[in-house]
Amino acid sequence: MRGFAHIGAIKSLEAHGIRPDMVVGTSAGALVGAVYASGKTPSEMIALADTVKETDLIEITPSQQGLIDGTRLRHYVNEQVNHRPIEAFPIRYAAVATQMHTNTAVTFRTGEAGLAVQASSSVPKLFIPPRIPKIGGKKYVDGSQVALLPTRIAKSLGADIIIAVDVMGEKQASPNSNALPTQGSSINIQRNHAGISATWGDKTMTAPVNLDKLNQTARGLPIDIPLGDLLGVIMQSIPTNTNISLPKQLPTKTSEFARWFGNLGANLTAEPEDIRAADVLIRPKMTGAAVFDSTDRTRLINEGRLATDAQIPAIKKAIKDAHTRKRTQIQTAQS
């Protein structure tokens, strides 16, 4: 995932003696930020990046609300932070999520870190939105819906100097709508022992599936047809290679389908106000990197480091200027 670039940015900052007092993250930034704020070193984070598997983070468990319930992601984060609450982290931390029904930003600054990251990373329609608290609480979805680059939120929490890492800043080529089939949009589904791959136009995405749990969960599940039928009985009645027509309620453009499936890198960009709120903006080269593609981890970490290395002079200047302003304010107040 593109979030691996955040690790490279952190590595560069610490290599130059710069350690943030607060970390505010959205989606993948919330995941990496939680692990870092809990006290993990860049070297430890790189080791985690090298060993983590998709199946450590996701498992398909279809329901009317989404395909992935986020429980594995939640447990993984809690394990990495040694099951400590956010308020026990050595670095202040906030995960940004979107309150689903009001479409407003919410920050999680205390409590269970894994649940905060799950909320911040729950891509609508792909992940089942967690309800917090579980009984009588509100539902939350991916923070990128309202704060892809949460710089203004960081400022509202008291940040003096904001170093922002925008892993969505690099524009991707727009899909060629002329290449789409004109009659009956369809998706090619293939399965094997490891999971399911879905091909839409020139895009292919693979999701690991626990086949036994998929069958058990989907049995008798009232999901909208035909997508529900596909997911519910795919292991019983659909061949290993087949084309399935998409229902009318699903997107009809490749870019929209990619977003629905979780490939948010196609079109999402930060709000201009959030870009302007950054004292220093770091934009790693993300060419060819999909949000859920974890096959190019070393390159993405390195791109994050290189992009941050290039901004170190600007970061140090911003820190110096902020200290100068603060001293001037103190002297003015005392005179």
PLM features: what roles do these ranges have?
Residues G25, G29:
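Gly/Ala-rich beta-loop-alpha elbow adjacent to hydrolase catalytic centers
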Residues M1-V23, A34-S335:
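Patatin-like phospholipase
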